[in-house]
Amino acid sequence: METFEVTDGVYGIDTGLFGGSFTAVYLFDDDEPTLVDSGAAATVGTVLEGLRTVGVPPSDLENVVLSHIHSDHSGGAGGLLEYAPDADVYIHETTAPHLADPSGLIASSREAMGEHFESMGEQRPVPEENIVSVPETGTTIDIGSNALELVYAPGHSPDHF
């Protein structure tokens, strides 16, 4: 696991998914600590270690912004909320229901990923009260001295921000 500073107050957390350098999680260490993506369920421990490395207790996490629903980017959200139960989880409105009930997502991921599926870990549901369903335009998240503007950018995934 490697945690590195991208710019002042922004850190990358290399989750090590698939056995290599695979950075899929970024921390904005601001008044409201915010993760962009959660990583896969199998990497929750690595993400927690990354938070602690930069001095952010997991329970202080205020927001998790998921760029899209693919398991390597969103699969760890439910597991992270066991350590940050008050965090809001932002996701595109079309895929928000898959966070509360990931059974359909798990089935389609298993089919699409084949033998690699097991390396993603067991995806846990995100409590509905933590989910913030985001429309395609107009959402800005104030995190303190910075703000994150969510820009709808479908392509890699139809729900991509």
Question: Can you say where each PLM-predicted feature lies in the sequence?
Answer:
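Active-site environment of divalent metal-dependent phosphoester hydrolases
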Residues: 43, 69-74, 96-98, 157-160
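Short acidic loop-to-beta-strand element that houses the catalytic metal-binding Asp/Glu
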Residues: 24-28, 139-140, 160-161
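Metallo-beta-lactamase
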Residues: 97-151
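Active-site metal-binding motif and surrounding structural segment of the metallo-beta-lactamase
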Residues: 44-91
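Short, surface-exposed connector motifs at secondary-structure boundaries
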Residues: 30-34, 57-62, 144
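Conserved beta-strand hairpin/beta-sheet module of binuclear metal-dependent hydrolase folds
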Residues: 2-54
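Ligand/cofactor pocket segment of small-molecule handling proteins
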Residues: 147-161
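Divalent metal-coordination and catalytic microenvironments
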Residues: 9, 28, 37, 47, ...
